[in-house]
């Protein structure tokens, strides 16, 4: 319907009128025939009649169109207010009429008092409600009902409390009924929602069960493989493998190669006693080569003779030389073992056993073993477990590493699932609410991962982003480096962010096992706890007996207790000499000598404490833990004066007595109860006493640490500066020859072949021999974090012990245990030994290993644990934190020897050619040199040559690495130009006949001298030699037999 004509100011154009309502057009619509009508008039007409109102043609509503120019003209007309009849004299444009009507003072409004039905102007509403309305509240009834009285009731005095209460009750009941209906609606809606969620939960549960069954099947398969591997790798008598026979093969070189690789050999030429079991074995045979034929060689054959020359006790180099010098036809005599019969009985649980402990083989050990070179002793042939019974192998022998490598690839293969997440921000400055982690150096690029999620953020409310997810794309752009990721995440161009995330497909937590298995594990845990309790009681009895024996006059020989070091294996030493050829360098022999004498009591104390939480009874308690604290030597005390040590010991004893006085009467009674007449105390009393002592000593150790820290703080500040300078001066050593660089190596370090510029190979393709395999470090996820926790426990060691604490040392926390004098030196390990035996304290097996390592995966989600690269980033942070915590106390404990521990190292994340990531150690020296270069460059950036000439301190110009490279290139070009000019001059002299024999002799001598000097320089310098080391050690050769010419002169200004 249109607008009334009398509302407009002045006359209205007839073209603005509607032919149906004869009013001014409101939202005009035009028909295909050209007629214009109001929208409210023409739409009902066309719907009913399906034709134009003028009856000219048939039309439909879809053919009607808006006339915007006509509408704009009408909106500019002046019109009176809608409330003109109520007194409003305002005249506005039609387009502003709606805005005026909202705030017009003459708009009709109903009184808000209950019962009043008057309609007033908006401006008169407040005055009416306060003053003139008969239904306004004026007070409370004083007759007893307590309801509000209106002005009308007070004026007429006709208020009835009973009727008012009934009316009020009815209103409340009506409200209750309304709320009840709403409650039923909400309950029905909630029931439907609950059913839907239960259905989804059931589907997820079924999927979880299917996944758990699939995982169990894989676990069973891997367990079978592990059992067979354990059985194959365990030492067995030679008679089980079958009889050996001597075979002679005749070989001819094809294209200069014999077509096979060898490993092994006696470790040293001087070792001619014949006791070593080393020999030369065939490790690989090239397909269609000279050795790959009927009557040729086979893998694992032991080479005895080559053309009559005995190689049974030869070294690896002697065997290579013998094959090189052999003339065709080459007669090779080998020892070959007959194939083993396949076991028919049931296979037991495969375990690796050393002298003192029994440890389960895990996947980390298998991966480490697969990367070791082939053993030099005849390895038992692996059985092919997954083949059908009727299928026989093509050869009698095969390489175990082939199976291990395939298994490693299958384990390392990760099936990823991708998810696209859209995050919507209401404001462009809102934070997404998650933190990313990535590499901080510039050597290699790596992925971007989600490390933390804010609980109340946009990402947390979305719920699809998880910790450990890798970000592949942001807003459709693939991420190449961290700069791009930061730029896209912080960009303010787009309020919405679209992320493409990748995570491992298997995302099961540890709760996938069924209830029966959990019950079984709980029972097993209780059994182990009972076993631990029983051992603790025996331990306490032996302690009481020992104390009584000491009081009766008997003495305990400390040397007897210490003699057990060489009788028990520490769990990390080598079991045979099969890996001796991994790196044939002189430092290995030194490491062997040191390793045999470095099995300390500290490792056993750490093991005893780590078993305390779990209750495992793998290792019995030993009397080694009861060595008196008085046995501490000068090396453990460091530079503490004797009077200070004695005063600290008295203070500690006083602390023990004061702490124990509150709980058990007298100090002597609570701390020294083994020496009294309480030998017959019951088990419950002993347990309570032990618990009280443990709690007291834990609080004492914290106070002791604070006392030591306050006592040493002033000295530490001065020593830190000296130690840092000493470390920088003497810490740069050759990593190829230094034994100190391996001082802190751990048992989960494995060897991986990488590309090297200095690989050595024999003439007949011995490239796979152990000597040409450089070493690199790879950390397993299980051991790295646990090792960091042990480092933190060792770092908190106190520097002194007390009398009462040495009596109960095995039952204390790691801080007291670390106070033993035998913890002063870390154990030296050989890199070639690592991985041959698992560490006892690292491997518990099964789910019971989790309680003893609370920091292992504390804040890492389950699905992120399957992401190898993300886990290694987290491990890097954990290891760096543990090392930083350990550095302070280690310098306090042994400040003299801290500078001799070798070059400082840091953990770096590296990327292999196949894309996998690993963590390795790199010297901090590179980083320090880079920082030093930047600092010097900043200091000398604003200095000119004239300024340097005027100043007293001659700084000199600093040349960057790129500039030094350019200098080297220019120097090379100048040298080549000089040689060219010299050669041209010599040619010219030859043509003129001026050259003489004397000059030729001089040139030959000079060239020979230069060549000899180059060789000497190579012997003096290496890749890691610095000018400071050259000046410190002089210009002597490494063996100290020669003195070379000075190659360098340094003038200090």
Swiss-Prot record:
Sequence ranges assigned to domain PDZ in this UniProt record: 247-338, 420-505
Biased composition (Basic and acidic residues): 564-583, 747-760, 828-843
Subcellular location, principal: other
PROSITE patterns referenced in this protein's UniProt entry, alphabetically: PDZ, ZF_RING_1, ZF_RING_2
Compartment(s) of residence: Synapse; Cytoplasm
Database matches in InterPro entries: E3_ubiquitin-PDZ_ligase, PDZ, PDZ_sf, Ubox_domain, Znf_RING, Znf_RING/FYVE/PHD, Znf_RING_CS
GO cellular component: cytoplasm; synapse
Function: E3 ubiquitin-protein ligase.
Protein name: E3 ubiquitin-protein ligase PDZRN3-B
Organism field: Danio rerio (Zebrafish)
